[in-house]
A protein has these predicted regions:
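GHKL (Bergerat-fold) ATPase N-terminal catalytic module, capturing the glycine-rich phosphate-binding loop
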Residues: 1-209
Length: 209
């Protein structure tokens, strides 16, 4: 039976379609930080040439409760998660960092896409209490390839257990991300064929790699 499928660029359009400008993008992400019981919500912009920085760097950070690997896989990369739509009420405890429950401010399941407006590539670091640090690497420009479906896109995630472990894991997820640009074998009409999603998108590919 036929089913709906979504092109990868639908995520790009959905995210940017909700955002009118940079301040709005930052505001939406801060709302998500507030909803996660953060109090110190900060943003920093470093321009090329500062402290040997070669390209402009934007940092957005908070002291919220963070995410585990399970949270990322089941919530952050799942569009339209419905906890806010259902108006679920938090209960004061470890999940609220022992703060009083808050009225949710962020968009219902798509506010996180605001980060795409801030630039590419993106490195996300998040840590939940009693869980290892999680790092996620992605370049939002990948979604501009109209040949890709959502299921074709690889989003590398790794758990980091120490500061010494960070460098190796960061290198690995950057390499894993490049798998998005490799040709793939698929079965079409009972025959194995090689699919290259980037054959017509080489200019976009060059800007990312």
């Amino acid at each position: 039976m036929p089913q709906f499928r979504a092109k990868a660029r639908a995520v790009d359009l959905l995210g940017k379609g909700q955002i009118s400008d940079l301040p709005t993008a930052i505001s939406e992400l801060w709302k998500n930080g507030y909803d996660a019981y953060g109090d110190a919500l900060e943003a920093y912009i470093y321009l090329s040439g500062y402290e040997n920085i070669k390209k402009p760097l934007f940092i957005l950070q908070d002291d919220a409760k963070g995410m585990s690997r399970k949270d990322i896989l089941e919530k952050w990369i799942v569009l339209g998660t419905d906890s806010k739509t259902r108006n679920e009420i938090d209960i004061k405890g470890e999940d609220t960092l022992w703060k009083e429950p808050r009225i949710k401010m962020g968009e219902k399941g798509i506010g996180r896409l605001s980060v795409a407006y801030l630039g590419s590539p993106m490195l996300m670091l998040t840590k939940k209490k009693n869980e290892p640090l999680q790092i996620l690497y992605f370049d939002w420009r990948t979604l501009e390839n109209y040949n890709l479906f959502l299921e074709d896109v690889n989003i590398p995630i790794a758990s980091v257990i120490s500061s010494e472990d960070f460098k190796d894991k960061f290198k690995k997820i950057r390499i894993d991300f490049l798998d998005n640009f490799n040709s793939r074998k698929e079965i079409v009409d009972g025959k194995e064929v090689i699919i290259d999603f980037w054959q017509e998108q080489f200019l976009l590919k060059d800007t990312i790699i």
